[in-house]
């Protein structure tokens, strides 16, 4: 197993649709690894993680806007392609960052974060 630190763009990180948080959901279905990167699966996974009105990640959104990204708590990933990685640990943080990136792209306030953070 490959270990170490990598730096990649947020767009290269795929949320895990088989996250243990989803198993008890009535609308949960197991997703095969070769389908994880599909847009509709990633959108559904992001919706699961965000919750209604972003209630599941609002604390992280506010923390990132105030404190930026804390380097001492890296997101753990598994390589599943040349430049794609599935998030193993840190799906909520990744979801919050993806939402903040979307806000940045629409010229909304993202606090202390900068384009390079995405």
What do these predicted regions represent?
Residues 1-116:
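Short, charged/polar connector segments at secondary-structure boundaries
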């Amino acid at each position: 197993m490959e270990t170490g630190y990598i730096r990649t763009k947020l767009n290269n990180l795929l949320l895990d649709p088989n996250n243990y948080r989803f198993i008890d959901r009535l609308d949960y279905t197991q997703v095969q690894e070769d389908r994880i990167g599909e847009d509709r699966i990633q959108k559904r996974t992001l919706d699961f993680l965000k919750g209604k009105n972003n209630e599941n990640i609002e604390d992280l959104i506010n923390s990132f806007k105030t404190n930026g990204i804390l380097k001492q708590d890296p997101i753990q990933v598994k390589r599943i392609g040349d430049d794609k990685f599935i998030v193993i640990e840190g799906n909520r943080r990744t979801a919050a960052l993806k939402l903040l990136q979307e806000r940045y792209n629409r010229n909304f306030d993202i606090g202390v974060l900068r384009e390079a953070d995405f």
